[in-house]
Structures are given as C-alpha cells and as structure tokens.
Amino acid sequence: MIIKKNNFRKILVAFCIGTFLCTGCHNKQNITQLESYDGKEQVSEAKEESRREYKYLAKTTVKNGDAEVRLFIPSESERVAASQSKATLHGVTINNELLKTAESPKQISKKRLKEEKDVLASKKKIQNIVSDKGSGNEKTFLFSLSYDITKKDTIYPCMEIIRAEKVTPEYVLKTIITVDNRYTDKESNSLLQEISAAYGINLQN
C-alpha cells in the first residue's frame, strides 16, 4: 500500500523582491531591491538587528573577490567555502553561492534548474518532476521545482526553489532552497515563513 504524505505539497511560490546587505561594492540600486553600501553609509548592527529578528535563522556572510553579502541561513550551518554557505534545519536546506559572472540571474537559475532536473531524473525513487516557467526581472529570477520521493511505500512530495539575484554588476547570489518532506516536522512551517521574509519569496501553504 502506497501512502502519500502531503506536508507542504501545495506551497505556492510567488516572486517578490528580497533585501540583502552587500558590502565591498559600489552599487546604487533601488533600496527595495538591494541595500548596498561602500563604507560611507554604514548600517549599524543595532539597526540591522531591529529589522531582522529570527528564531530559526542566523546571520552569515559569503565573499568572493571584492564582493561580500550578508544574509540569513538556518542556525545549524555548514561552511562550504568563503563564497558559499549551506545549512539544513527541520527538513529545509538553504544553499547560497556568490558568483562572479557575466550571466544574467535568469540564465544562472535556468541552467541550475536543468542540472537539478537531470540529477533527479537519474534516480529511480524520484518521480513526477515538474517545474514552473519561472518569474522575475533583470535583477532577480527564480524557478520552483517539485518532485516525489518514494521511501518504504511512502511518497514524500518535495520541492526546490532556485533563485538568482544580481547584487553588483559583476556578482550574482545563487540560492537554492530545498524542502525534503522525509525530514520536515512541526517546526518546518515556521522556518519557511522566516525564509520567505528573509529571501523575498512568498511561500503559501
């Protein structure tokens, strides 16, 4: 008998603009898209903390060349490299990478989507791989991807969000958020709400 678990199966992913703090660059974008500064307009720690108080997320920094981005990941973090940060908590994984590239956010996220679909398709216990058409603009673009994992006669609907944001003219922040329903629990929904606020992704159950 096959049992299908429906936790977070009907999450709707809508595009909205998030905010990250970028240092070490001279980028003058609209503040609703990116809050950047070059040392002349410092954002105080107190001000930053007052705007970003999370239960499950902690601050981290990714660096590449002269670009540095401060962002939030689950508190149980795993440092991969200076330009990357990765963390998993309550069945939700966030993987960030700061890339120096001439490619657009749409190109980067689309390429990553194809790679991920190819990997998933090669695994026997993964089925029903479906992605949306993507949404965004020249500065930020994202795709959502859903699939089912079968384990011991139970089907676990899972999903990924692939997001890319141009944080300076030369650098793009690539973010992959994975929800693995084999490991989600009663805390997962609250964690996803915080991720929604921190990354500018509207997640609706």
Where in the sequence are the language-model features?
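Conserved polar/disulfide-associated segments of primarily extracytoplasmic proteins
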Residues: 80-171
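Short, well-ordered beta-strand elements
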Residues: 169-181
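Bacterial N-terminal signal peptides that target proteins for export
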Residues: 2-12
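N-terminal targeting sequences that direct proteins away from the cytosol to non-cytosolic compartments
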Residues: 25-84, 179-205
